[in-house]
């Protein structure tokens, strides 16, 4: 049996499910690698990738805008009680910069940061990985959990 590389499955259930719906031994995630410098507003399209990696040194602080894609809002893409986790990898030079704001579908959201405090700087000559988990709790209502991790 040949399984298509980009296989999408939608399963709907009536009643109670007592067993895991899906067990994965190994799953590959789509990564977009771009020779782009982080600055300004960066649109993160969850329909396109799970990981976005900017390989050119950041040139200014940025706002990360999470959305479905340019024509689909995250609100439309996600159902209430669904969660999506994304990773944004940012190459840093000296000076380093940081994510100064988070928006979802262009609307400001204050994430809950690991350790309780939002970053106020990037890490010079490193790669900073911003991991954000978004939980949709209602129509256009979200809770976001975020972290910044330095890699050298």
Where are these regions (language model features)?
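Acidic, glycine/polar-enriched metal-coordinating patches/loops
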Residues: 57-152
